[in-house]
């Protein structure tokens, strides 16, 4: 019994060895005796496979044909479904990286630093521009509650996006060496999520704010005079203007509308990558987004400077909605005259009661 079992095991082992030997011999003969010009499975799947095999024999370690095929951006096979999911490597990504790191970041940083430096130098030279006349104590409504609410919505969301964007754009250069990798990674992730959620709110607020102030921002002839004299910033010369001067109108049309819409549109392309846009479109959107944002921050720096420490009483207009008559007469003479004639369209503050017959359309408020 034991002899028969031992004999069977021996025969099985012998036949198994012969089978694997024959299989290996056939594979070797098939590889060495393949007809000239015949394509192997690998060469059919990857046309550069034979080229890579030859390159490995001539220059071991040189896998240039493989990477040439990878960088060709040809669509191959993947179980993932999506735009460009079959493209292993997109060559435009390196071009985008070089433009972002070697052009946008250095130039944007220099431009922002230059504008902030110019504001600081101007303040050191000119200081806060005080009223030439004493305040009268009679206050005029310049902005109603809705106008101020929309302005502050845009201001707060813009400031949030600006700070978070600056961290993501310049943080690797400025913050990382100071706070270390762990804290910087946490801060950058927080800024990215904050940026993504606040961005759409800013976009909507920009549109509402544009139509809120559109009526009083149409260009007029006297705006050319204001621009020629630079609003009296360098000469102390009185230059009349309407409810908004030419400088504020430039900020409205170029900064709020032009750059604001550009930043919003490009940001939405980046924020929602599930609308069939490819990587090339998102790389272009990123370049446009960064460039437009830097320009908008530069213009906003001038706007914020003039509205806070640059001009006395300007911040009160957006804080309380009211300005002194002396301020209105000195900075917006034409609007003041219309106001006093009862032709201004400034609404009455809520809760002040009906306007008496014959009174100006915009009500005054005693300090």
Where are these regions (language model features)?
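Membrane-embedded alpha-helical bundles that constitute the cytochrome b-like, heme-associated redox core
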Residues: 2-5, 29-367
